[in-house]
Amino acid sequence: MAEQLILKGTLEGHNGWVTSLATSLENPNMLLSGSRDKSLIIWNLTRDETSYGYPKRRLHGHSHIVSDCVISSDGAYALSASWDKTLRLWELSTGTTTRRFVGHTNDVLSVSFSADNRQIVSGSRDRTIKLWNTLGDCKFTITEKGHTEWVSCVRFSPNPQNPVIVSSGWDKLVKVWELSSCKLQTDHIGHTGYINAVTISPDGSLCASGGKDGTTMLWDLNESKHLYSLNANDEIHALVFSPNRYWLCAATSSSIIIFDLEKKSKVDELKPEFQNIGKKSREPECVSLAWSADGQTLFAGYTDNIIRAWGVMSRA
C-alpha cells in the first residue's frame, strides 16, 4: 500500500528560524525545538484540529542562536548547542540548566548524545570536535586529521557493536571516528560542496550526508564504503531516517523529499501552501526535521518560524 504525507497542523511560538527539533520515545507528547530567537521550546502535543500543540515551557539561557538540540534516551534531559560558543544541559521537568559546557572558541553548530547518554559530542566553527562527559568536562578535543573548515554536524552511532562518531564539514568531507580512541577511521570523499547534515540510521548501519551540492550520499558504516547517491536537486539543509520505514527525508531549499531507500525513488515531496508571499520575497524553507518515535509524524522547522507536522497516511 503506497503512502503519502499530509499536513496535520502547525506549532507557532518561535520568533526566529526553527533550527532544530528533537522527539522522545519516552514522552511521545513532547517535542523540543531550538531557534534563532536564542530559546528552546518544550511543546505539549495535543494534535487538535486548530493547533497541533502549545508551548509548555520556554528554555532561556543562551545569548545567541540555538543551532541544535537533542533529548536523552530516557526523556529527562536535553542538550542544546549555540552560537554563544557553549552547550547547555537542561532538566526538562524543571526547565533549568544543570550544566554549561565551555571550551569551544567559536559558534557550536551541532551536538549529539551517545546511546548510553554518558558521552556528548559537539562540533563547531572553530573546526574542532569535542567529547564531553555529562558533568561538563571536556574529555577530548579532536584536531588530528580533523576538519579543515567548520564542523557542521556530529552524530553518535546508536549501534553499541560499532561505536563511532560521524562528522561533516564545510571541507566537503564526512569523517568517521572510532569512539574508543578518538582516531579517524574513514574519510568519506565525494561531495563537491560544503556539507550541512549527516544522519545515521536507527540500527547504525547507514549514514547519509547532504549539503550544497544537492546530492544525498549514503555510506555503509560497517563496511566503510559509499553505497549510492540520491539527487535532491537543491541544497540540503537537514536529513533524517524514518525510525520504522526504509525512508530518508531531506529538507532542501525548495521542499522536503521523502526517499524510499529500497526502490531508490521519491515517496513524496512536501511543500506547504505559504500565505502572503510576495513575488519578490523568498518562500520559507525547511531547515530542521525530526520524526516522532512511532514514525507516523514528521516535524519540520521552517524559516518562517513555524513548525509543521506532517502525518503518514495510506494513499486512497
From Swiss-Prot:
A matching Pfam family: WD40
Described purpose of this protein according to its UniProt entry: Component of the ribosome, a large ribonucleoprotein complex responsible for the synthesis of proteins in the cell. The small ribosomal subunit (SSU) binds messenger RNAs (mRNAs) and translates the encoded message by selecting cognate aminoacyl-transfer RNA (tRNA) molecules. The large subunit (LSU) contains the ribosomal catalytic site termed the peptidyl transferase center (PTC), which catalyzes the formation of peptide bonds, thereby polymerizing the amino acids delivered by tRNAs into a polypeptide chain.
Protein name (record): Small ribosomal subunit protein RACK1
Any Gene Ontology CC annotation: cytosol
Main location per the UniProt record: cytoplasm
UniProt KW RNA-binding keyword: no
Biological process, per Gene Ontology: G protein-coupled receptor signaling pathway; GCN2-mediated signaling; maintenance of translational fidelity; mRNA destabilization; negative regulation of cell integrity MAPK cascade; negative regulation of glucose mediated signaling pathway; negative regulation of p38MAPK cascade; negative regulation of translational frameshifting
Entry's family note: Belongs to the WD repeat G protein beta family. Ribosomal protein RACK1 subfamily.
Organism, scientific name: Neurospora crassa (strain ATCC 24698 / 74-OR23-1A / CBS 708.71 / DSM 1257 / FGSC 987)
PANTHER family the record matches: RECEPTOR FOR ACTIVATED PROTEIN KINASE C RACK1
GO terms assigned for molecular function: G-protein alpha-subunit binding; GDP-dissociation inhibitor activity; protein kinase C binding; protein-membrane adaptor activity; ribosome binding; signaling receptor activator activity; structural constituent of ribosome; translation regulator activity
Entry keyword set: Cytoplasm, Repeat, Ribonucleoprotein, Ribosomal protein, WD repeat
Listed InterPro entries: G-protein_beta_WD-40_rep, RACK1-like, WD40/YVTN_repeat-like_dom_sf, WD40_repeat_CS, WD40_repeat_dom_sf, WD40_rpt
WD repeat segments: 13-44, 61-91, 103-133, 146-178, 190-220, 231-260, 281-311
Quaternary assembly: Component of the small ribosomal subunit (SSU). Mature N.crassa ribosomes consist of a small (40S) and a large (60S) subunit. The 40S small subunit contains 1 molecule of ribosomal RNA (18S rRNA) and at least 32 different proteins. The large 60S subunit contains 3 rRNA molecules (26S, 5.8S and 5S rRNA) and at least 42 different proteins.
Transmembrane segments: none
Compartments in which it is found: Cytoplasm
